[in-house]
Amino acid sequence: MLTRLKATFRYFNNVVPFRLGPALITTAVLVTLLLLPVPEGLKPKAWGLVAIFLTTIVAIILKVMPIGVMAVMAIVVLSLSQVTSTSSKGAIADALTAFDSPLIWLIVVAILISRGLKKTGLGSRIGLIFISLIGKRTVGIGYGLAVCELVLAPFTPSNTARGGGIVHPVMKSIANAFDSDPAKGTEGKVGTYLAMVNYHANPITSAMFLTATAPNPLVVDYIAKATSQSLHLTWTSWALCMLLPGLLCLLVMPLVIYVLAPPQIHATPNAVAYARAELAKMGPMSPKELVMSGTFALLLLLWADVPAMVFGTSFVLDPTVVAFVGLFLLIITGTIDWDDVLSEKSAWDTLVWFGALIMLAEQLNKQGVITWFSEAMKGAIVASGIGWGATATILVLAFVLSHYLFASTTAHISAMMLAFLTVGVHLIPPEYVAPFMLMMAAGSAIMMTLTHYATGTSPIIFGSGYVTMGTWWRVGFVMCVVELLIFAVVGSLWWKMLGFW
């Protein structure tokens, strides 16, 4: 009997287009969650939404089918179950709400723009220049990418534009110069390591400057509200507070990733000579390379809000608008064509799966799940009677780790941060409130490390295929812990020296 069951399982596993074992596990998770009693304080439909969200995450982790298919599954199940509406028309409208998100289109267009770097050869040229300067060791190239992030961060309010639209194309070009390409199965040479450094520099620099990511001003506003305006961070005070722990994180991060996701190529002693020889063969920049570099420079200036600094706030442009301007310029100048846009599969794949995850996260908030979670956390801490140190630790960890439920830092901060800050103000002695607030501010960026959908930058880099999901989540969790420890220990001492507590 057992032999027959095994044979039947193997047969179906070979004929169905999905992995049967993971599919059965995912189905069991969904059924189990739906059979559990609805937690007090949640409506049945809200609990059904939680079940759909968690099942989708499990299906993605177990790789039942490609992530885009799992996203479509989530849309179908949510629409049929009508957990967000009283009709299928309302449910499908809810399921598709995130696809008009400017953030998603910023990601898609940034991927499309990066195609121009490859097509024109400018990306290869940049990669070779980079290698000719610092290409003797792979870890040195990693530090170079981190420095690029650091230099751009104060002037680029969109961390997605910075990490995914500016630095990532350079990283891909460097990887290609070493013949490290996911399409060839050679991503492990240097690509996986450099992609991880490319990504993990992004949350660190986002924490270091008020203008390095969009939700930081909201964090400042919430801190001021929670402390009744007694702690109001300016651009300068934010940068000063985050300077030392942030720089230490940037110093440590490439080394930690070097251990967690080591490149197959460690030393590249001949790379500098090779790069210089290849640059000599390429000759001067072609007209299309000049157009591409000019467009790239324009994007950087507009993403850094330079026109607004010079001419006033009426010249502020949304990062997504800027991205579309860049894409349009590349198309009308013939630098890329419409077939290039249509054939960039990773952009459209990202549109589907990231849109679905953002939609699920937004619906969790709308259905009151996030508020319920926040209130339950507050109640549990108050009832436990634990000391203020443990309270602060639990609040920071709960806030950061709950980002597994979110596909947007702005949505997470908007939904939960003020509630957590308010609890902290009530339960932590006044003289220790400031370091708690600064830890929460740092944590609001550090939480980006956790998943491949944590912020707009992550799906761009993950979608390029250099890093598996298992590696991404493993490295992400370790880096989250390391960075939190650095900010908690070094940051707290630094803030004491600065007189914040």
Protein language model features and the residues they cover:
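Hydrophobic transmembrane alpha-helices of multi-pass small-molecule transporters
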Residues: M1-L106, A226, S230, T236-E375, ...
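Membrane-embedded alpha-helical segments and adjacent helix-loop junctions characteristic
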Residues: R10-V15, V38, V69-A183, E344, ...
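Hydrophobic, membrane-inserted alpha-helices
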Residues: T27-V31, A51-V58, L145-V151, N198-A201, ...
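Hydrophobic alpha-helical membrane-insertion segments
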Residues: I60, V197-L210, W353-Q363, H426, ...
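Alpha-helical transmembrane segments of multi-pass membrane proteins
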Residues: I107, V139-A153, D179-S206, H232-C241, ...
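Re-entrant/interfacial helical elements at transmembrane boundaries that shape
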Residues: T160-N176, A195, M208-T227, N270, ...
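C-terminal transmembrane helix pair
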Residues: A177-A183, M242-G246, G355-L360, I370, ...
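Membrane-core helix-loop-helix motifs of multi-pass transport proteins
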Residues: F178-H266, T457-V490, W501
